[in-house]
Amino acid sequence: MSKLFVGSEIGQLRRVILHRPERALSHLTPTNCHNLLFDDVLSVEKALHEHDQFVATLRQQDVEVLLLQDLLEETLAHPEAKQWLLRHQISHYRFGPTFANQIRAFLLEKNNKELASILLGGLAFIELPFKAPSMLQQLSDPFDFVIDPLPNHLFTRDTSCWIYGGVSINPMAKAARKRESNHLRAIYKWHPLFSNQSFPRYFGDENRHYDNATIEGGDVLIIGKGNVLVGISERTTPQGIENLAKQLFRTEQAKQVIAIKLPENRSCMHLDTVMTHMDHNVFSVYPRVIDKNMPCWSITPCGDQQLAIQEKPNFEHSLMQALELDSLNIITTGGDSYEAEREQWHDANNVLTIKPGVVVAYERNVYTNEKYDKAGITVLPIMGDELGRGRGGARCMSCPIERDGI
């Protein structure tokens, strides 16, 4: 049996979870897209074609691709998993007691494929075949959603992240994404691929309100050698990082967490939108945000499950020290000032490394890809004119569950 383990950002990628969000994207409109954290509506047909190409590119590199909807459908075959998900998704507090019971009964009549599609892609009031004694139903527009679509499930990196020998099921920052975590909780507990293996769940797998302790996988880079690099961003808080660090140290899966502060704006919502690891000493960086002389924080274990937190004056030096390197090769976003800003917006720095020196990147970022090529990095180009409008690149759209260390 293959081992669930992610030991780096650059070691051979072996297995990964992706999501092809057809139903959810078809429910995006100009009216609701901003509430669902998209800047615009996407062409569904083109986006799915681009995603299929992404899947094919990974499989051509001998990466096993698991699709989230398939995993959820297979998880729902377990009766306890189905009951647990519906109890958490369709609560009396969200819908009122009578209406919630009738929605659950309606959904239990669906086969597992249909139910997975609804949970991921949404359900409108007009699709309900019954009228409940419910003020909520009576006051709602027929085309309002009973169950909101989850188009951001496209970005499987964020909802859970495998860090060395375990997983963090992340408490998400935005209301539009919070339901995503329950799908991964169910999959990791009941799907036979995971239920037959033992691994620590660092964070996010309890029935509790995590308050301000949010964390998203786009901010988490497993840089190797027992180190984890995390961005403090609009989505990931210091409280989230410290709670994650405590569990990493308790389970002896990591020896240091390095944290850096990012601006809180949409263009760099996660660390991996401005920085990714491409080869042993090679990083892609957007220089307007990531500077080698910026401060960072080193978090290490300190007896009796306490944390030692020390501010460091030089990020580059801390990174080299963690990776046991004498120097770093920093490749900055390509083009002039205007071109670099445009390409960063379209995820030029958000690449998925397949193995050292080989990355998947959007083909549209020609200036940055040219710099990668000149630096000896092999770029496997994929289309991203539609997918990129969701504000995520190849790394954002992938959740590695098996990758070699360095």
From Swiss-Prot:
It comes from the Bacteria. Keywords: Arginine metabolism, Cytoplasm, Hydrolase. Its EC number is 3.5.3.6. Its main location: cytoplasm. It is an enzyme of class 3 (hydrolase). The keyword Hydrolase applies. InterPro entries: Arg_deiminase. The active site is at C396 (amidino-cysteine intermediate). GO terms for molecular function: arginine deiminase activity. Pathway: Amino-acid degradation; L-arginine degradation via ADI pathway; carbamoyl phosphate from L-arginine: step 1/2. It holds the Pfam family ADI. It is found in: Cytoplasm. One of its GO terms (biological process) is arginine catabolic process to ornithine. GO terms for cellular component: cytoplasm. It catalyses: L-arginine + H2O = L-citrulline + NH4(+). NCBIfam families: arcA (TIGR01078), PRK01388.1 (NF002381). Belongs to the arginine deiminase family. This is Arginine deiminase. The gene is arcA.
